């Protein structure tokens, strides 16, 4: 912070300094405690340091100023050995997670500095050290994470034109890596960022030095980004085996040696996680090296326009494809569903295996019901197992894990009756983890406390020494009860009672009215407003025995709990594999339930290049309006036949909805889900492109039309004959003739098998384009049916063969509530324009575009024709005729 915030109110005598001033000061002039703080802060300059002092985390100097502003907490001061106090702000230690989350959300990193020794036994200043750094991509606390969404951190290694990427969710242990080489590398990188939607990105210096690329990432995504030292981007494969124990066999090592960029990104990301987490990363035990060609390519625009997992406007889930399909019963299943929707498959065999499993679950209502009922009682095994390896799982987490593992035999039994290959494989892969279940069940009590350092966790019968000490404690407390009865009898004080608190220990309490009866052997310990508290030698001896045993029990229980947690952590790979089985079954079951509820059909998925849909519906809109209220439509596209469908019709008639519907049905089929149609045959699509609408990108200095043309250019470069392209009203951002020319040329290019040949839905308001169907093979005209009733129109929402040259724009304006006087005037203007258009020959049927002759789009013809029409031949002299002809010739130049 180079300048001091104006909204911070300083108290008199407080140091007014920014970081650069502090650096210039002599550190030895500060108090011993503050010197220790400054030593720690020096190592974590890029973080806000939460410095533990007793029951609070304190922040000093610039950190305090920032925290006071961002967290809206009081800025105060602390004596620091200087003439003036250091700015200070503090938060209660038990609320640290909440405050840290707020700072992270605002783009800060937070370093947690804990007391590493008991202040009671410390000699001198308490030893403190940073135990963890919190960043947006390294959060593991369940209450700070979305249950059904991964929290990814991405590492990018740029070398020349190529990229190596690694992505990890440390809350689950998932780790993915890939290499981006070939054409359009940066666009592919953007697509991968959109696919994973990380909350944090780290990258090497070469990436940060490319300002144009960094600006594009920042403008398209709201992601925390930071540069990580190049020295950690090592290409040593051995590190992964020796330091992290991730690679298990020589084949994996050999495969990685050929992928230098991948190895560099993996090493850097693991090092970053080590630096920030400072704990075991054993739950990250497998690196999934994925090939981009395994999945359907969906660029940023396609993901946004199709609203697959989030709404375009408010980023919410409701109103998306995910919202329609998410009937998962577990958090793990919800996260896997999101990943599947982001990664539609290309392998026909794998797709059909999923579809067959969904079909079996859909057709067997009892089977599906058993799956749902059982999985509803299974918690987040994936994140729970990660917490075990992290060492931050408490006893309640263990019981939650135990309760989940208890249901695995039921899941295994359900799967044993299944016949489809996918479900059979899940049966084979499911590890019931009975040994882990038994370990927790016999060691941890059923309803343990939240804290793990106060005892009351370990079951009787698990540890003999703990049992012995607990017995001694119980007997001691029985002696206390006996002592109370004896003292009442000896003293005659009937309301005498023996009590205990953590500050004063055990005591005998006597009310004021009986203080005169207290014997001399009672030693006063504490005076109350209502009476006195005493201690006796006998009670003191009992207290020593009881508290000594209790302290030993608490310490032993904690030690035993840690051992149990470590034992569970050793099984993390088994737990993760089982979590994957459960989540896969959960998603397949959700697909089956949606298919049953919404009357979806099983698509026939092939590689024949056809998209044939009968009575297709838009899945999201159908759910919103209700079954039976959505008008279905057919679709036929064939890479060897009708590749490009030109769709004309009025605005608001449903063109955009129809095109998105086809794209979503195709995507759903390749995810392995049933689709909203009565029949569907889907030839696998390698990429889906969408050019739907446009909005000015003023931050990049690009107009609507420029953005549109850039998107079209990308489509023309990257689309193949196996792609699906959605083009909605291209060419609107420029003049009519420019727009029509571009739309015409784009349609010609895409329809040409030699140049592109992608299956395309092309909605347009340029009715001239319907002529293309007669001029070029592979193009067919469609339109949205409209019923006219007097001055009104009814949108039938039905796609029919054949083009239309009616736009019904004024009718739409009337429906939208435009004042009648305006629509009436618009009709008058339209009539006038149509008359002029007829004179200029614009509506002649079967117009030909012949190279070398007049351009069909030359607007001068209309003006000249109108001039000729005004000439009165009866009054025109030969000289006038020649002059008029010269003017016309001049205009034709």
Which role fits each region the language model picked out?
Residues 113, 136-145, 280, 419-422, ...:
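Active-site phosphate-binding and catalytic loops of NTP-dependent enzymes
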Residues 233-241, 296-297, 312, 403-478, ...:
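Amphipathic heptad-repeat alpha-helical coiled-coil/stalk segments that mediate oligomerization
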Residues 351-354, 374, 378, 472, ...:
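Intracellular alpha-helical coupling/juxtamembrane segments of multi-pass membrane proteins
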Residues 13-360, 369, 373-389, 393-485, ...:
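Charged catalytic and DNA/RNA-contacting regions of genome-maintenance
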Residues 61-62, 259, 329-330, 334, ...:
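ATPase nucleotide-binding head domains, primarily ABC-like/P-loop NTPase cores
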Residues 193, 198-206, 538-571, 675-677, ...:
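Conserved catalytic alpha/beta cores of large enzymes that bind or transform nucleotide phosphates
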Residues 394-397, 873-893:
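Short, amphipathic C-terminal "tail helix"
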